[in-house]
A protein has these predicted regions:
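The canonical Cys-X-X-Cys-His
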Residues: 33, 40-47, 98, 133-143, ...
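Sequence context surrounding c-type heme c attachment/ligation sites in exported
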Residues: 34-38, 63, 127-137, 156-165, ...
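The feature marks the first
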Residues: 21, 28-76
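Bacterial N-terminal signal peptides
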Residues: 6-14
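Electrostatic cytochrome c docking/interface patches
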Residues: 19-37, 52-54, 104-130
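Positively charged n-region of N-terminal signal peptides that target proteins for export
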Residues: 1-5
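Axial heme c-ligation environment in periplasmic c-type cytochrome domains
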Residues: 51-57, 73-115, 148-154, 172-197, ...
Length: 207
């Protein structure tokens, strides 16, 4: 039986507000980007499918979201210790090309832990009215594909350990500079550890 799963990671996740699809000027070149990602493969996999849970999978991620994240990391707006210095010598066009490369790769879908399935599905599709938690589908779509024009990320197949950390960082306020409207912070603040883990597992198997 196939389940269509997903989560609130407007994380890993950022939203800068809705916008149009990337203009010709904004678009990068995937073939050029392929030549720039060799150093990225150690953590994110050769094709963007991470093999280690703590590192996010980038394969199939929305172009606009990827580009926004790379720009934030390079400018210091999003601090990731492991990424320190990694983008310093790259131009903005390089960031566009890298984003284009990963956006056209096929993401790998994982398996949902059975004991987390029901809670994760309920939260993702219905939210929690008593706690004021909205359904994740509003921004991330029923299949976890995100919203490319609005720069809301693809969640389908994302690594559960990474999603768990992202949501906990939103909840604590550690991850705040990338989301001016504080939507993810407000949502994550209302989630307990059990709910976060259920959502993280759920999105890993979402398709």
């Amino acid at each position: 039986m196939r389940f269509k799963l997903s989560i609130i990671f407007i994380s890993s996740i950022l939203l800068t507000g809705a916008g149009d699809a990337p203009s010709v000027k904004e678009k990068g070149d995937a073939e050029t980007g392929k030549q720039l990602v060799s150093a990225c493969s150690a953590c994110h996999g050769a094709d963007g499918n991470s093999l280690a849970g703590i590192w996010p999978s980038l394969a199939g991620q929305n172009y606009k979201y990827l580009l926004k994240q790379l720009r934030l990391v390079k400018s210091g707006g999003r601090e990731i210790v492991e990424m320190t210095g990694q983008l310093d010598n790259l131009s903005d066009q390089d960031l566009k090309d890298i984003s284009a490369f990963y956006s056209v790769q096929n993401n790998v879908i994982g398996q949902v832990e059975k004991d987390k399935l029901e809670l994760g599905r309920k939260l993702y599709y219905s939210g929690n009215l008593e706690k004021g938690v909205p359904a994740c589908t509003a921004c991330h779509s029923p299949r976890g594909l995100g919203n490319a024009p609005a720069a809301y990320p693809l969640l389908s197949g994302q690594q559960p350990d990474y999603v768990t950390k992202a949501l906990k960082d939103y909840r604590s306020g550690e991850r705040s500079n990338e989301d001016p409207s504080k939507i993810m912070i407000a949502i994550a603040y209302k989630l307990d550890d059990n709910e976060i883990e259920a959502l993280s597992s759920f999105v890993h198997g979402l398709h």
